[in-house]
Amino acid sequence: MIGKASLPYLLLTLVAVAGPPPPSWTDGYVITNGIRMHYWRTGGSGKTPIVMAHGSSDDGLCWANLAKELESRYDIIMIDARGHGLSDPPKVDDAVDVQADDLAGLIRELKLDHPIVMGHSMGSFAAAAFAAKYPDVPRAVVLEDPNLAARPTAPGAGANADPQARRAAVLARNNRSQADLVADCMKNSPKWGLSECEAWAPSKRRHHPDTALGRGVGARPSMSDLFAKIAAPTLILKAEAQGELRQQNEKVAAILKRGQIVHIEGAGHNVRRDEKQRTLAALRPFLARFDGAAVGAGSE
């Protein structure tokens, strides 16, 4: 007989393995910027392409729930960044903006016609760096909670932390079970819901430990520096913020030539996961401006 206390765990175990992507989706590889990059694609002839770049330790399928909301109108390409998902691991001499060139190569290899480029966290830096370096390529840019204002750093965190310790921590998470990771996700991020946690958990098992060994060669440009070079219309979806932090975010966003910032009420760093409906309410009208829009037409 199953006790009441064990029933929730049993149910979680039964559903912990996320189902496969929809059968209409495809996946593949391209050679870009010296690596083999994996991607998932929703497809659809004649649809405006959106390239989605995930955050650190996530992978392409972490976009699945958002992609399902948008695929009827857009051809969505969900990449696995180097060192993530099924893509090749990073290299010790990777430039700090290497992922911008990874995106450029993928777009070229897939022959995407001026895609919209969207990124979260680490992916938002990649998307912004790409749009700054290749200003004539993106039709539009969407940045989910990019780092606009300086954030306090905990002692021992970030670039000063022991890279071997970080590497060991990534490997330890690689070896955790799907059920255990999903349970942690549901406990720590209850607003996400089960399907988001089911997509999140496998990405932690595929995250390559070598991503912990370096932060990239060269000086990392600030978002202010990148924004000054971005020509495409840009939407920033920021976590909820008040007071001075909100003002700082808006000040940096104002550097964009054709930008807008929306602080999503109730959302933390994982904006779309915390508040999907509010995110979609801001995202859909912006994307609709570029459905089949002629590049350079200045859709506003």
Feature-to-residue mapping (PLM):
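Active-site loop/oxyanion-hole signature of alpha/beta-hydrolase fold enzymes
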Residues: 33, 40, 68, 78-118, ...
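Flexible "cap/lid" loop of the alpha/beta hydrolase fold
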Residues: 132, 139-174
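Short N-terminal helix/helix-N-cap motif within the alpha/beta-hydrolase-1
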Residues: 60-68, 86-89, 151-152, 246, ...
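Hydrolases whose catalytic domains are alpha/beta-hydrolase-1, hotdog thioesterase
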Residues: 126-130
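Conserved serine/cysteine hydrolase catalytic core
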Residues: 206-254
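Catalytic active-site module of serine/aspartate enzymes centered on a nucleophile-bearing elbow/loop
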Residues: 258-300
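Alpha/beta-hydrolase fold catalytic core
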Residues: 2-50, 73-74, 113, 187, ...
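Conserved HGGG/HGGXW glycine-rich cap/lid loop of the alpha/beta-hydrolase fold
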Residues: 35-86
